[in-house]
């Protein structure tokens, strides 16, 4: 096993720190790092991780590593360490990019890139980042929850601790193979289920069906005959309409003749319209004159009747008025007689005009009826008025239509039946072909199924065997782990407490003994739990060191003693002082031990942290 000694760490402008911070790790077996919260005690472990592996276990982002108070984004890390007989110097400068320099025995052996250099560092340190950080750094949130963890988490940690990942990886590989083969098995079982279902339908396959003969049906002669019958029927309806119209026209002539019968043997009356107009004008003139004379007569009659003045009562002479009245009467009488004569004549003329109008209307109606009848008869041929039997033709049409429909129906039914038969036979042939194919495939699938089932069973046995092997190796390794824990626990608790691991079927139980009495972690005080956890932590590191390729001198205990009393801290310092080739850094806040070297973290006036 190679021995690595990290001797000195120098750094500048990292997080809370200023320039030129120096800490020597190999000078004292135990160093207490003291300071208030937030001053940067844990940062020292972070610097070591970032310098050696370009990552940190606290999950701090790269951009957050730059100094909080420096004007430039730039930091510097420097470490001096040895491996066996070789001396190394590791230097890292980070600005916008990172430059990493590795010097071995005074010779620069850096790679062309930072990535290549870090691969070289990992080979020198003899392990990956996880192994490195478990060896050098333990905090409240790292391995101290091991004893309270779930069974699965505890087992996973122990598998990793005892370097049994190879069995886990082998088991995972076999499980992956088993899953793949199981998928094949499921696929084959699915195929077999389909084949079985197909073969189960063999009894319900049925038989081939026979088609029927499609009857011969020549529709054309019937269709032609139907067309002719429809034409005849249409013609018959037209002739029937012509005959009906002619009858109506004859009837109209007869009605017109009856209306004209009173005027048939009489001379044609004369139109008296002009004479009526003339007599009407004369009557209007005579009536107007008679009315005027009558008004004069009435006036003179009124004057002749007034014989006394209404104002003075004097007797008035009415002779002139009486004479004018008589003259008006003489003038009115012939006008009145002439008016009566004209009125009588006008009455007679109107009567004669009414007779003329009645005659004219009857004569016009008769003439129009005769003309309409004659014109209609002349526009039609004699054949247009021949009577055809429409009912017989309609019966013929219905019979022909039914005969055509029946013929079509028989052909359609036969064709539909044959189409159904063809589809059913196609399905039958497809099922038969499917069954024959399934019978041919069944032997092959059965053979494959047997082989794959056997392979799955073998892998299940192998998985169970690996599980039992891991359990056996864990059980054996846990005894060594248990002895190592109890070695440290006896020192930390003065022999009061002991710890044991018990396998309950497949579960790994943690049992605590207090003065020989069985108890649990939950029943212990916080301080007692801290001592038990510290003993476990030291045992874990010792195991890691024993199974690793290298032994690293540095152990950084970051506030893992928060709940330990003064006596417990003294015991821890004394225990660590006795550990060979181990330089321990204990981060704490208060009590210090006289055997421990003390470094205090302080803050200067500019807000930068520094070591004193």
Curated annotation (Swiss-Prot):
Its EC number is 3.1.11.-. It comes from the Viruses. It is an enzyme of class 3 (hydrolase). It holds the Pfam family AAA_23. Induction: Expressed in the early phase of the viral replicative cycle. InterPro entries: P-loop_NTPase, Rad50/SbcC_AAA. Keywords: ATP-binding, Bacterial host gene expression shutoff by virus, Coiled coil, Degradation of host chromosome by virus, DNA replication, Early protein, Exonuclease, Host gene expression shutoff by virus, Host-virus interaction, Hydrolase, Nuclease, Nucleotide-binding, Viral DNA replication. One of its GO terms (molecular function) is exonuclease activity. ATP binds at residues 35-42. GO terms for biological process: degradation of host chromosome by virus; DNA replication; double-strand break repair; symbiont-mediated suppression of host gene expression. Residues 163-193, 288-459 form a coiled coil. To phage T4 protein GP46. Could consist of two subunits: D13 and D12. Possible exonuclease that may play a role in viral genome replication, DNA recombination, and host DNA degradation. This is Probable exonuclease subunit 2.
């Amino acid at each position: 096993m190679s021995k690595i000694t990290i001797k000195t760490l120098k750094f500048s402008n990292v997080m809370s720190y200023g320039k030129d911070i120096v800490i020597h790790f190999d000078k004292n077996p135990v160093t207490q790092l003291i300071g208030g919260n937030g001053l940067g005690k844990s940062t020292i472990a972070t610097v070591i991780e970032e310098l050696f592996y370009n990552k940190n276990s606290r999950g701090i982002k790269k951009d957050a590593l730059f100094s909080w108070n420096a004007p430039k984004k730039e930091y510097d890390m420097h470490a001096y360490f040895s491996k066996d007989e070789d001396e190394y110097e590791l230097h890292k400068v980070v600005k916008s990019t990172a430059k990493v320099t590795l010097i071995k025995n005074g010779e620069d052996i850096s790679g062309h890139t930072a990535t290549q250099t870090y691969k070289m560092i990992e080979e020198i340190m003899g392990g990956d980042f996880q192994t490195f950080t478990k060896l050098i750094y333990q905090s409240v949130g790292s391995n101290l929850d091991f004893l309270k963890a779930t069974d699965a988490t505890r087992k996973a940690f122990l598998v990793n601790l005892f370097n049994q990942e190879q069995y886990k990886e082998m088991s995972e590989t076999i499980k992956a193979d088993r899953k793949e083969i199981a998928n094949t098995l499921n696929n084959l079982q699915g195929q077999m289920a389909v084949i079985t279902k197909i073969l189960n339908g063999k009894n319900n396959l049925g038989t081939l069906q026979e088609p029927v003969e499609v009857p011969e049906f020549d529709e054309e002669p019937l269709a032609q005959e139907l067309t002719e019958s429809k034409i005849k029927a249409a013609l018959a309806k037209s002739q029937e309409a012509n005959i009906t119209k002619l009858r109506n026209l004859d009837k109209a002539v007869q009605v017109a003749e009856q209306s004209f019968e009173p005027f048939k043997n009489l001379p044609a009356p004369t139109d008296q319209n002009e004479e009526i107009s003339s007599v009407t004008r004369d009557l209007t003139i005579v009536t107007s004159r008679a009315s005027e004379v009558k008004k004069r007569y009435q006036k003179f009659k009124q004057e002749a009747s007034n014989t006394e003045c209404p104002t003075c009562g004097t007797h008035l002479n009415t002779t002139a008025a009486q004479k004018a009245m008589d003259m008006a009467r003489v003038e009115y009488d012939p006008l009145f007689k002439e008016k009566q004569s004209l009125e009588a004549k006008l009455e007679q003329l109107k009567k004669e005009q009414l007779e003329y109008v009645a005659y004219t209307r009857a004569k016009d109606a008769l003439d129009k009826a005769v003309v309409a009848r004659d014109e209609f008869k002349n526009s039609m041929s004699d054949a247009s008025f021949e009577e055809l039997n429409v009912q017989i033709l309609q019966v013929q049409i219905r019979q022909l239509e039914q005969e055509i429909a029946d013929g079509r129906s028989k052909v359609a039914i036969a064709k539909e039946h044959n189409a159904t038969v063809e589809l059913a036979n196609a399905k039958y042939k497809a099922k038969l072909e499917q069954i024959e194919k399934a019978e041919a495939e069944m032997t092959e699938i059965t053979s494959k199924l047997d082989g794959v089932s056997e392979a799955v069973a073998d892998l299940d046995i192998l998985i169970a065997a690996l599980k039992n092997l891991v359990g056996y190796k864990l059980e054996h390794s846990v005894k060594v782990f248990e002895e190592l824990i109890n070695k440290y626990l006896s020192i930390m608790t003065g022999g009061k407490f002991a710890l044991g691991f018990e396998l309950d079927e497949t579960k790994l139980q943690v049992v605590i003994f207090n003065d020989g009495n069985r108890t649990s972690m939950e029943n212990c005080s916080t301080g007692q739990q801290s001592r038990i956890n510290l003993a476990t932590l030291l045992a874990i590191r010792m195991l890691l060191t024993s199974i690793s390729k290298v032994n690293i001198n540095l152990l950084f205990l970051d506030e893992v003693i928060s709940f330990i009393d003064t006596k417990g801290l003294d015991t821890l310092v004394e225990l660590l002082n006795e550990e060979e080739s181990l330089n321990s850094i204990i981060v704490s806040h208060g009590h210090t031990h006289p055997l421990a070297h003390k470094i205090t973290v302080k803050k200067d006036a500019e807000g930068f942290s520094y070591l004193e």
